[in-house]
């Protein structure tokens, strides 16, 4: 239900296609009714051709509760403090404060589920990135630096070629016949 509710709420808040041509006198994904006038406890959300789309108090309460409690507050107090300009403080104190607050922030961005790898003591080198892309499959990216490729080329030329496999003697029908005659 938690996964479907954001989709449901976003669809409810967008302009919906009129379903009146099918014969249904409903609007807003079936949660509202097309009427000439809304009742006292109902609210008008959108238009159904020449009529009003009226939504009952339960649906209004459902939407309000979702908007109030269902959507997490991205900008909580700590983030708002972090965004304010600091007075009489050094950059080190600001950095320590930001680093202490970062684990508490829940990110809702596109990169929230992306894993990042940080390599300490990395030296900048010329690198070549090779990306393999096949439609409908996972993309794998291989990155090799100049020094790594040179080492691998040198090691490939320095190593001796593999020994050929021992020759397999396959029995021929004539040899089998000779052995059978000897017995």
UniProtKB/Swiss-Prot annotation:
Indicate the secretion signal residues.
Answer: 1-19
Region annotated Disordered, chain positions? 141-183
Gene giving rise to this polypeptide: DEFB129
Q: Does the keyword tRNA processing apply?
A: no
GO biological process terms, alphabetically, are: defense response to bacterium
Q: Where is the composition biased (Pro residues)?
A: 159-170
Can you tell me which family this protein belongs to?
Belongs to the beta-defensin family.
This protein's GO CC annotations: extracellular region
What are the UniProt keywords, alphabetically? Antibiotic, Antimicrobial, Defensin, Disulfide bond, Secreted, Signal
Protein name listed in UniProt: Beta-defensin 129
Where does this one sit in the cell?
A: Secreted
């Amino acid at each position: 239900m938690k996964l479907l509710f954001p989709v449901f709420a976003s669809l409810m808040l967008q302009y919906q296609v009129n379903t009146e041509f099918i014969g249904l006198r409903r609007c807003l994904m079936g949660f509202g009714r097309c009427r000439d006038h809304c009742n006292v406890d109902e609210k008008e959300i959108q238009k159904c051709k020449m009529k009003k789309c009226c939504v009952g108090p339960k649906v209004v309460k459902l939407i309000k509760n979702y908007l109030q409690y269902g959507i997490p507050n991205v900008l909580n107090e700590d983030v708002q403090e972090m965004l304010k300009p600091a007075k009489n403080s050094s950059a080190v104190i600001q950095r320590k404060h930001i680093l202490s607050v970062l684990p508490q922030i829940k990110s809702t961005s596109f990169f929230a589920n992306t894993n990042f790898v940080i390599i300490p003591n990395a030296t900048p080198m010329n690198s070549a990135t090779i990306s393999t892309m096949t439609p409908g499959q996972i993309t794998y990216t291989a990155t090799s630096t100049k020094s790594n490729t040179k080492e691998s080329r040198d090691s490939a030329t320095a190593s001796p070629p593999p020994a050929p496999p021992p020759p397999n003697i396959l029995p021929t029908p004539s040899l089998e016949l000779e052995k059978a005659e000897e017995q």
